[in-house]
Structure formats: structure tokens, C-alpha cells
């Protein structure tokens, strides 16, 4: 059974795949990832909680299905080799009490008329982006001189600067802590002009041997390989 839906105590879940065996039903949570992450286990745990509380049928096992990144396609895809299928039964059973407690906490927050006091941080974007970023995060974060625009700066460091009242390039005093690229950003903003290092560009292009070809790994995002 694909996409079977269940609800218990206002908690709705949709199971990716259910398979009936002689020992009971096996539950499969399918992910387009190449490894199991902790929030995948909690996805499976909430499904386990709802199904156990409903007690409609016997559950034999629960699995998380991920992609095998060592798989190499040769004509027909072998699904057994293409997927990694791992039991997380012990994990979801261990998480059960925590999940029940978390549901109580979240229902309490949902019923309250007051917003929960939560600071902004990496948790706002991972594992999934929050829909209230425009409400909690600074209005100037997308401005060209916002510290949130620093190239390749860890999000925790950006937030640390912001919490210190340093929200724009002009307020950054510790220049030495920045990378050369980030310093260039500040200089380009200050001069209102791009920084073009022609000699550095020439050194790079002089090393290129023609004809040249490119293969962009990010062009294809399909989980199932298209080509052998």
C-alpha cells in the first residue's frame, strides 16, 4: 500500500509504503538521501507512534529507505541494489516516550495565544526552512551590506555578529577575522565598484588547454539515474 494515511489525536501521518508479511505489516519511510539522518528517524518515530496508538494491525518492522550512492546503472535498474533498506525499529521504540512528550509540548504551544520565545539560529533553516523567517529575522538581511550576505561565512558566525549588534559591513571592526573574499566584499561595497584582478584571471586562463569540456554534477538532480 502506497501513501496510506492515518490520524490519531489530531496527529496526521502518511506512510510511504506498507507491505503485509506473515509476521505483520512492514513500514517503509523512503528518502531521497544517501544516508539516514536523525530527523528521518523522527519522521519514522511519529509514524510508529500514531500506528501503535491506533492499534489497528500488528506492525512487524519499520524501515528507512535511502539511495545507494555506490550503485552504478547498467541498463535496467536493480531496485534491491539501488536502495539501502535499514530497520530503525529499535530507534523508534527508544524515541517513543520522547515523541509523546514532544507532542504534548507542541500542542501546548499551538493552544497558547503567546509566541514561544525562540531566538533565530541555524535551526530556523535546518532540517527544513521555517515559514516565519520574514517575521523573526531582520528586515535588512538581504541588503547588499548585511552581514548575512558575507560569502561563505558560517551561519552561526553571522548570527553571532548580529546578536552583538553588528548587522552591516560598516559595523564590522574585526576585519582580521574575515577571509580574503569577505574583505573584498567589504571593499567592493565601500568603493561601490567591482574588484577585478586581471592578472589573477590571466594566470588562471593561461593554464587552460583547449578544447575544453565541462560536466556539471548539479545539472541533474534526479534520484534515479538516467544514464548508464
Predicted features and spans:
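Conserved catalytic cores of phosphodiester-cleaving nucleases, focusing on short active-site segments
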Residues: 2-4, 13-36, 47, 216-219
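Flexible loop/turn segments at secondary-structure boundaries
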Residues: 35-36, 71-72, 168, 220-224
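Conserved RNase H-like, two-metal-ion catalytic cores of nucleic-acid enzymes
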Residues: 6-7, 200-228
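Metal-dependent nuclease catalytic regions and adjoining charged, substrate-binding loops involved
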Residues: 35-38, 53-133, 137-138
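Extended, structured, electrostatic nucleic-acid-contact surfaces
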Residues: 131, 135-152
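Short amphipathic alpha-helical face segments that pack within enzyme cores
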Residues: 42-50
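Short helix/loop capping segments that flank catalytic or ligand/cofactor-binding pockets
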Residues: 138-140, 159-161, 170-171, 222-225
Amino acid at each position: 500500500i502506497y501513501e496510506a494515511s492515518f490520524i490519531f489525536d489530531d496527529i496526521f501521518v502518511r506512510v510511504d509504503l506498507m507491505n503485509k508479511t506473515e509476521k505483520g505489516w512492514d513500514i517503509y519511510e523512503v528518502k531521497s538521501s544517501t544516508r539516514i539522518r536523525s530527523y528521518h528517524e523522527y519522521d519514522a518515530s511519529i509514524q510508529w507512534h500514531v500506528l501503535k496508538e491506533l492499534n489497528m494491525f500488528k506492525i512487524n518492522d519499520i524501515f528507512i529507505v535511502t539511495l545507494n550512492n555506490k550503485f552504478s546503472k547498467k541498463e535496467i535498474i536493480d531496485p534491491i541494489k539501488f536502495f539501502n533498506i535499514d530497520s530503525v525499529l529499535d530507534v523508534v521504540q527508544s524515541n517513543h516516550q520522547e515523541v509523546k512528550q514532544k507532542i504534548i509540548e507542541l500542542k501546548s504551544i499551538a493552544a497558547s495565544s503567546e509566541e514561544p520565545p525562540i531566538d533565530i539560529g541555524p535551526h530556523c533553516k535546518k532540517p527544513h526552512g521555517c515559514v516565519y523567517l520574514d517575521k523573526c529575522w531582520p528586515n535588512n538581511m538581504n541588503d547588499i551590506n548585511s552581514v548575512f550576505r558575507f560569502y561563505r561565512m558560517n551561519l552561526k558566525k553571522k548570527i553571532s555578529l548580529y546578536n552583538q549588534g553588528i548587522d552591516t559591513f560598516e559595523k564590522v571592526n574585526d576585519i582580521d577575522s574575515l577571509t580574503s573574499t569577505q574583505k573584498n566584499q567589504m571593499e567592493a561595497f565601500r568603493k561601490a565598484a567591482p574588484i577585478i584582478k586581471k592578472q589573477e584571471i590571466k594566470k588562471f586562463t593561461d593554464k587552460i588547454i583547449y578544447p575544453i569540456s565541462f560536466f556539471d554534477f548539479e545539472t541533474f538532480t534526479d534520484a534515479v539515474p538516467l544514464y548508464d
